[in-house]
Amino acid sequence: MWAFPELPLPLLVNLFGSLLGFVATVTLIPAFRSHFIAARLCGQDLNKLSRQQIPESQGVICGAVFLIILFCFIPFPFLNCFVEEQCKAFPHHEFVALIGALLAICCMIFLGFADDVLNLPWRHKLLLPTAASLPLLMVYFTNFGNTTIVVPKPFRWILGLHLDLGILYYVYMGLLAVFCTNAINILAGINGLEAGQSLVISASIIVFNLVELEGDYRDDHVFSLYFMIPFFFTTLGLLYHNWYPSQVFVGDTFCYFAGMTFAVVGILGHFSKTMLLFFIPQVFNFLYSLPQLLHAIPCPRHRIPRLNPKTGKLEMSYSKFKTKNLSFLGTFILKVAERLQLVTVHRGESEDGAFTECNNMTLINLLLKIFGPIHERNLTLLLLLLQILSSAVTFSIRYQLVRLFYDV
């Protein structure tokens, strides 16, 4: 029977600091409200009848508290080395990993805040996490440098037991950082969703790390917990203010901060495959959104659901375009998606019948298509329930189905 593992002193200190971080986040966000509005870092909630100005980019406060917690925490994993008799050699590789991870996250918070202020186009959003992930990749190169993977059983007769990916492994890690940072940003637009999904993912990773503390890779999972515990509590403080009806918006800053934090622990904690499994809803949303992201089907600036003022519920939002302007590829994708009941298409729109409209291709709109109009709070709860169920599926795959592919 599994027993709760004994936590080392640094983790207990980390937990205490994280609890203080929760209190600080809950306190600082309303305290800085007027400062953000004065700086015009504010906007209106498009899914509310009220036109009240709501402060944006509050992820920067959450991220700043997170960094302060970990900056103060840096000495604690190495306390033994302050007593000469208890330290044979200073663990430089662990210190470099900790500093490199903090550098990557710090860069991502800065670049995310720059995006919120400057409102950068999407092509630049892909470059930001790529640049911020470079310190992370260099830490991996200097500390580990291992690019060999264990080949799944079905492919071993072709590739053998081990395969050295070389530079492709670094490309994979860079793409993982880009995906994690943008995946949360794409699945967004209703109160509490960005912070809520990040909270569920971080809680799932914490459970996974705790289970694995008794395994062979204890140090890797302790390292992950150093980041995930303060992230969980600072995000919880942010969600307190971002929950329906939201008093603040998290901004791109939080999405980038959350994504890079997940990428850091997944890469340096050596469980990137499991990390991706925790992103099942985000992966589906990305694949479902791909036709619009690649502009095979026209993509409006905002794809969030629209509020029906009479019912107070959210309904699907639509993309409207001239039928003749749709490319052959777009027409083909639209027909296939319609046949699979993944989109609702209205043809012959407007007086001359020259327009077509289809629902915006996001997981949020797909749920509205399946279940009909839903109140915003209930829609967020439904999406978070889906995130929790996907985590349950991930644990089933990680501890049961994995035997079909690997020797465990």
From Swiss-Prot:
Residue sites binding Mg(2+) per the record: N185, D252
Subunit composition and interactions: Homodimer.
Designated name of the protein: UDP-N-acetylglucosamine--dolichyl-phosphate N-acetylglucosaminephosphotransferase
GO molecular function terms noted in the UniProt entry: glycosyltransferase activity; metal ion binding; UDP-N-acetylglucosamine-dolichyl-phosphate N-acetylglucosaminephosphotransferase activity
Similarity field: Belongs to the glycosyltransferase 4 family.
Residue stretches spanning the membrane: 11-38, 59-78, 92-118, 122-143, 167-186, 193-213, 219-242, 251-269, 272-293, 376-400
GO biological process: dolichol-linked oligosaccharide biosynthetic process
Binding site for dolichyl phosphate: K125, V178, F179, C180, T181, N182, A183, I184, N185, I186
Taxonomic source organism: Cricetulus longicaudatus (Long-tailed dwarf hamster)
